[in-house]
Amino acid sequence: QGTIDDIYDTVCVSMPPGTGKAQPLYSKVLTPDGFVEMGSIKVGDKVISGNGNVAKVLGVYPQGEKDIYEITLDDGSKCRCSDEHLWKVQTIEDRKSGKYRIVDLKSMVNNYRRNLQSNYSIDYIPKINFSEKKLEIHPYLLGYLLGDGCFKTKNIGFATADIEIVEKIKKILPDNHEVVKDAKYNYRIKSNNGSGRGHKGILRLSLENLGLFGLSSHNKFIPDMYLYSDHESRIELLRGLLDSDGSVCSNGTAAEFTSISKKLASDVADIVHSLGGYASVNTKKISRREKENEKTYLNVKNYGATR
C-alpha cells in the first residue's frame, strides 16, 4: 500500500450505505455494458452494485483534490482511492466469527498486518448479472477456438483427441457448417452456405465482426460482448476455454488455463471473477528451439464456475 505521488480530482458516487467515499475520476466503474470512467457517471446511470446486481446512481458528489492510495490484493488486482474510502472487510478475528465491519482505508493502513499476517480481507466478487446478449457464435465454441483453435487463415480449425468435444462442437455450429477431419487430431470447420471464390461463411464473418479473424495465438482476446454476456453464456465460454487449454492441478483444488496471449489470460481471469471465483495470472518464460518465448499461465483457484 503506497501513496500515489500525484493528487487527483476525486468523486463520490452515492450507492448503498457503507460503500464508497472517493475514487479518482479515471477509476473504472462496472456497468451492465462494461467499464466506464468514474468521471463520466451521471445521476440515473446504471452500474453494477456490490451484490452483483444492477443499481441506479442516486447522486454524484465531487470531492475535490485528495491524496490517493493504491491497494494491491493477493490476486494481483489493484485499485486506487482516498483514505476516506469505506470497505466492507473481515479482520483475523472476524474471519473466525463470520462477522463483517465497515472501515475506512486510513484505519486499515495503520494496522493492515498483525503477527506477520494480513489483517484484512474482502469477499470474492459475487456473481455478476449482466444482461442477456445476442451472440452469433455459441460461447462454448468461441471459448474452444480461443484456446485450441486456429482462425488465422481462411481455414478455421481446432485440435482435440476427445471425440466428445468434436460431437459437441458439431451440435453448436452455425447453420450450414460441418466438421471435417483433416488429420488424427486436427479438424476443420467448413461452410456449406454458398460457393465461389471469395465466399465467406457465417462463422468467419462473425469472427471478423468480433475482430478475431486473422489473429495469431499471441493476440487472442475475449470480445466485450462475451465478457459482459449473461451468466450461463459466460459459464459456457469458460467451459470451452478450459476444455481446450485447461488442466486440473495435481492437488485437485484448482484449474489452470494456459495461453501465450497476456490479454486472453487477463480476460479469462475477468470471466472467473465475474462468476464469483478467484483467479490469479502468473507468467513464466520457457525456451523452445533455442528461441525464448514468454507464456502466460492463468491459475483459477476454487472457482466452482462450471458446476
Feature-to-residue mapping (PLM):
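Short, solvent-exposed coil/turn segments
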Residues: 6, 24, 64-66
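Short, solvent-exposed loop/turn positions at domain surfaces
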Residues: 32-36
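Phosphate/NTP-binding elements of NTP-utilizing enzymes
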Residues: 1-22
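Short, basic/aromatic beta-hairpin or loop at an interaction surface
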Residues: 22-31
